[in-house]
Amino acid sequence: TDWDSYYAMLKAFTEQDPDGNGKNDTYGVAAAGFIGSEAPYTNYLPQFWQNAYPSFTYDESGVWYDGFNTQETKDALLRLQQAYADGVIDPESLTMGTKDVREKWWSSDQSGSFGAFTYWSGYWNDNLVNNMDKNGVDSGLARLTPIAEMDGYLNRESPVYCIIDDGDGDDSREQAIFDAVFETMFDGGTVQTLWVYGAEGYHWSTEAETIVTGEGTDKEKTYEYKDGEFHLRLNPSDPSALWKKNAIDPSSMICSLENGFESATDLTKECNEFFSEHSVDAPHSASCDGITNYGGTINDAKNVVIAEVVVKGGDVDAAMDNYVKTTQDMVDEILGQLNAD
C-alpha cells in the first residue's frame, strides 16, 4: 500500500464512528509524541516520517549531517500538519507518553480511542491482544506492511549495559565486574535463567500445579502443568495474567538456554518474523561532547518547530529557518566533532 491508502484508512477511523456511539470522537492514529525523545525518533509515526531521520545521521560516504534540517523532515512535518488539521491524529499525541497511548488504545471505553498504533514487536503483540481481550475490545489486529514510500520499519540499536572505566589505570575492577555480571548473564544456565525469567518458585516453576488467571472474573482461565514442565506463574503485579519476562526478553536472547526453557508464544514468534522481514536497521546513534552539551537545547528547538508547524499550522520554511538560526553554532560544532575522523 502507499501513503494515500494509509491516510484514507486513518480518515475512515476518524470519520466513520468505529466505536458506534454516534459521536465524532475517534482518531485514526495516536503516538507518544510527534517525534520520539530517543533513537530512532520516528518509530511511533513511521508512515508520516517515512525515510526522514530528524537527528544527526550520515550519508553513504559516512559524512554526518543534521537530518532535522532536510526536505524530508519538512515533508514529514507537512504530513503531520495535515493530519492534525483534519483531526486524524489525536492532538494529545503532543504530550502523551507510551503508557498513555497504549492504555487509551486498549481501554474498555473506546470513545477517544484510535485505529492505527505502531508499537514494539515481539511479546508486545501478546500484551496488546491480552489487554484488549481483558477489556472486552475486539483484538482482531492486522499487521501493516510498510507503505511504498518508506524503506521499512526501523530496527533500533539495542540498549546496552556498560562498565565505566574508573580511570585508575588498573583494569582488575572492571574485569571483575565483567566476570561477575556479563559472563554469568549469558551462562546458558542458572544465572541467565534468572535474568530472563526471574526467580524460581515465584516467577516460574517446573512443579506440577494449577494456575488460574483472572480468578472470579468473566476472563478467568485455568492452566494445568505437569511435574517437570516449565511454566510461568501469575504476574505478581497483575493476577489476571501470567508473568512474561525479567530483564532479558526470552524472544530475543543472544545465547540460548541449555535447560531448554521456552516461553515465547506463536504470536510473539510470528510478530518477530514479520518485523525482521519488514524492517531496516536504524542509523548508528551519534555520540560526541557537543551532543552531550547541546542535545537538550537542540531538541527543545525541534519541539518549537513541531509545535509551530503541526499544532499551529505555521509555515514550515519559516519555522525551519528559525531552527537554523537558533541551533547553527551548536550544530556546526557537533558536526565538526562527528566528522573529525
Tell me what each language-model feature is.
Residues 1-341:
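Extracytoplasmic/secretory soluble proteins
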